[in-house]
A protein has these predicted regions:
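Hydrophobic alpha-helical segments and helix pairs
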Residues: 91-147
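Short loop/turn segments that connect beta-strands within beta-propeller blades
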Residues: 47-51, 85-89, 136-140
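A short loop-to-beta-strand structural motif that recurs across blades of beta-propeller domains
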Residues: 41-44, 80, 131-134
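Blade-loop segments of beta-propeller domains
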Residues: 47-81, 92-105
């Protein structure tokens, strides 16, 4: 069996990552989580049925996204969890993570089968095991479920 890999979009991402397929809308979401070292982090959306591509630049480092039932997103940004409305571009804070480490930020994350959004922290210099694994529950409470992560 052989596969053919095809480039769908030449969007110039520095670090395109975290793809999420929204089965309800037929849309592919992903992040260009470059951080402020290269340019503004951004959220991207591709509608394969039309070829339409949208992106939103952020003033925060972005680590992960999850799709909500209403077509909006939940984001794991550098300092906490946020709602994001693609129609307005508005960010709404859900909760900050209680992390005293100045070099840490939320990085990668995914939703489990119970609908809980997990996001792990990372040390920007990848040296110290001081980060946590955080869980955002459907009641919007957050819990630190593990620590000692680099």
């Amino acid at each position: 069996m052989s596969y053919r890999i095809e480039n769908l979009l030449n969007c110039g991402n520095h670090l395109g990552e975290g793809p999420v397929w929204d089965v309800d809308t037929g849309v592919l979401w992903w992040l260009d989580g470059t951080g402020r070292r290269v340019g503004n982090p951004s959220i991207w959306r591709l509608m394969p049925s039309t070829g339409c591509v949208d992106n939103w630049s952020l003033d925060h480092d972005v680590g992960a996204l999850a799709v909500r039932e209403n077509g909006k997103l939940v984001l794991a940004l550098d300092d906490g969890f946020y709602f994001f409305d693609p129609d307005s571009g508005e960010l709404e804070l859900i909760s900050l993570v209680d992390d005293d480490q100045p070099r840490t930020r939320l990085n990668d994350g995914k939703v489990d089968r119970r609908g809980r959004f997990f996001a792990g922290g990372m040390d920007d210099k990848e040296e110290l095991a001081v980060c946590g694994l955080w869980r955002l529950d459907s009641d919007l409470s957050i819990t630190k479920v593990d620590d000692g992560i680099i």
